[in-house]
């Protein structure tokens, strides 16, 4: 009996992570779209949905048409909104650290997409981080040697990549 309960708890934890991660991705891509705008911003917004589909994450608007489980749909909705709110709050602080997080997330998505034989998604991630003004520590080193900014970008890149990795953006 304990093993079944443990398995159920593991599935619940996985469900929660997948739903929050979906919200984080939609929030990230909403920020990209807000920064870039127009056709290009709209096109790059699809990074979120492509990643959610690639990794079988849990997005309310991707489930609502095919699921009749009201409790699961409601929970997914709430957790998606929670993820979006986290990103909205984060991106109100438009500094090197936060811009590094955005880039770190996109680089983790891009590398994972490449390993899953989706190179167009990899290219889209590079386009998004450049056009949105997110900061890549290695590219930044070419342009500036401001040590404090560089350190914040490195830390942001690490945290952004780890958020995605532990949220399921991996092989």
Language-model features: locations:
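Alpha-helical transmembrane segments and their helix-helix packing motifs
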Residues: 1-171
């Amino acid at each position: 009996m304990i093993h079944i309960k443990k398995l159920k708890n593991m599935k619940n934890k996985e469900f929660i992570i997948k739903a929050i991660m979906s919200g984080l991705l939609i929030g990230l891509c909403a920020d990209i779209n807000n920064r870039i705008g127009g056709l290009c911003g709209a096109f790059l917004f699809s990074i979120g949905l492509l990643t959610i589909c690639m990794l079988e994450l849990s997005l309310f608007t991707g489930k609502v048409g095919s699921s009749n489980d009201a409790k699961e749909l409601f929970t997914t909705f709430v957790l998606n909104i929670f993820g979006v709110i986290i990103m909205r709050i984060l991106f109100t602080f438009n500094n090197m650290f936060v811009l590094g997080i955005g880039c770190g997330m996109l680089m983790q998505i891009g590398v994972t997409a490449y390993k899953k034989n989706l190179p167009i998604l990899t290219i889209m991630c590079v386009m998004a981080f450049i056009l949105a003004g997110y900061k890549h520590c290695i590219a930044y080193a070419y342009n500036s040697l401001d040590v404090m900014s560089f350190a914040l970008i490195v830390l942001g890149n690490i945290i952004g990549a780890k958020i995605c990795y532990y949220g399921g953006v991996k092989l």
